[in-house]
Amino acid sequence: MFRLLTLALAAVVAVAAPAQAKAPFKSDRIIVTTVGQGPDVVLIPGLSSSPKVWEQTVKDHPGYRFHLVQLNGFAGAPVGGATTGDVAAPAAEEIARYISEQHLKKPAVIGHSMGGTMAMMVAARHPDEVSKVMVVDMLPFMGAMFGPPGSTSESLKPTAERIRKSMVEANDAQRAAALNATIAGMIRTVDMRPLALADAQASDQDVSARAFAELILTDLRPELKSISAPLTVLFVRGNNAPVTDAQMEGFYKASFVSLPAATLKRIPDSDHFIMFDQPKVFADEVSAFLKN
């Protein structure tokens, strides 16, 4: 009888004891917060942005556990380890480490702009860690937009350095004017511009400049064939693009030619921040992506 009581008590204690908590994730490159319950989805914002760009996305899609990534040095976050060198690539490695160490079960990954670059990095370099990827308005080689046909990372180094230097050396007035013009060209929904502008203004000038130069020189086209997860790419032509819709579609098809299974879809009547300019369309695309 005593043995039975002892075993019963041990069983009760085992059930009542809390599971061992996961060690908190520590990084000097990214800060991650989680919202909701359900299948895991990693959301990565773009250059000089914050997870605030995903607020409506989270609201529109209950039933998922969203992992909101904030890069150090952007939108008021401490610079941390992003003091020198590349910004996107090291942060992408930290996202992959986060997925592994926090035991996420092959999450979906959605990245906007530079976040899209990082999503492709994770998918190509850690293909077993993700289930599917959505890239929001980003090419595998952004530098192609900054030079003549046939430009390479090597040939664009002077351009990238010139842009980096001009961003770092801009005074307050010049920086404010540049940010206002840039945001106006990226978001046609006027009411949504202040959010993105505030994030950009709060970003570290040097970190943003190095990240932009890094994006110009990052050519992921040779790595696309390493992506085994389904890839969806949403893109826009944009008001200021000196090309037709058909030309932009052709440009994206050519850029992703080594990944023929990728789903490429142009979103009309939108600039770079599709989630702001076409919120209903964007919500529908994300819903289809997550459910597929």
Task: Mark where each language-model region is.
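Conserved HGGG/HGGXW glycine-rich cap/lid loop of the alpha/beta-hydrolase fold
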Residues: 30-80
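Catalytic histidine-centered segment of alpha/beta-hydrolase-like enzymes
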Residues: 270-279, 283
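Conserved alpha/beta-hydrolase catalytic His-Asp/Glu region
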Residues: 145, 150-151, 166-225
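Conserved loop-alpha-helix segment in the C-terminal half of the alpha/beta-hydrolase fold
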Residues: 60, 230-231, 235-270
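Flexible "cap/lid" loop of the alpha/beta hydrolase fold
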Residues: 133-169
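Active-site loop/oxyanion-hole signature of alpha/beta-hydrolase fold enzymes
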Residues: 35, 67-110, 114
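Conserved hydrolase catalytic core segment
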Residues: 105-147
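Alpha/beta-hydrolase fold catalytic core
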Residues: 2-42, 61-65, 105, 260-263, ...
